[in-house]
Amino acid sequence: MELVMKDAQGALTVSETTFGRDFNEALVHQVVVAYAAGARQGTRAQKTRAEVSGSGKKPWRQKGTGRARSGSIKSPIWRSGGVSFAAKPQDHSQKVNKKMYRGALKSILSELVRQDRLIVVEKFSVEAPKTKLLAQKLKDMALEDVLIVTAEVDENLYLAARNLYKVDVRDAATIDPVSLIAFDKVVMTADAVKQVEEMLA
């Protein structure tokens, strides 16, 4: 199949298996959820009644005071007491096979092509690391919410994009399922397309 180049004459020939496969919603959902879960810190921690600092002595005798019976100042009912079912640090990561991960990326890329959300260009760069230059370039292309993917890390482009809302710059080796579906449009250079194709082959 062929992808039309926006800034040059002609088209780029690409693999049908990478950019023309059916959309597998269940697979994409599973991989996206797993990827997002892997980004969780999982470091939150609370103390149970066994871990809270304080005396183990019964606050007052069982009967005769007129007050409600109480056996510990560490009770979850009490202020500064322990937490019932306290949260503990945990690993939220989920296992995703390489074949599944690659399949999800291919599925997403194919859907981007079908929805005309993937824009292929010969090259994409700015002369200097100036936000103003990139903002004007995107305005000329009628792009706002966009992920820019280049073959190699372009420092000028990266620095220029840092202060732009809903604009991100990645090199082909660091694309991920969440980023690809998070933006309205994805701009990829021809070299990046070839690199992604080789990576997912």
Swiss-Prot record:
GO terms of molecular function: rRNA binding; structural constituent of ribosome
Pfam families from the UniProt entry: Ribosomal_L4 (PF00573)
One GO-annotated biological process of the protein: translation
Cysteine disulfide links: none
A cellular-component GO term for this protein: ribonucleoprotein complex
Keyword annotations from UniProtKB, A to Z: Ribonucleoprotein, Ribosomal protein, RNA-binding, rRNA-binding
Region (Disordered) residue spans: 44-71
Reported function: One of the primary rRNA binding proteins, this protein initially binds near the 5'-end of the 23S rRNA. It is important during the early stages of 50S assembly. It makes multiple contacts with different domains of the 23S rRNA in the assembled 50S subunit and ribosome.
UniProt-listed NCBIfam families: rplD_bact (TIGR03953)
Subunit structure: Part of the 50S ribosomal subunit.
UniProt similarity note: Belongs to the universal ribosomal protein uL4 family.
Protein name per its UniProtKB record: Large ribosomal subunit protein uL4
Organism annotation: Proteus mirabilis (strain HI4320)
Organism lineage string: Bacteria, Pseudomonadati, Pseudomonadota, Gammaproteobacteria, Enterobacterales
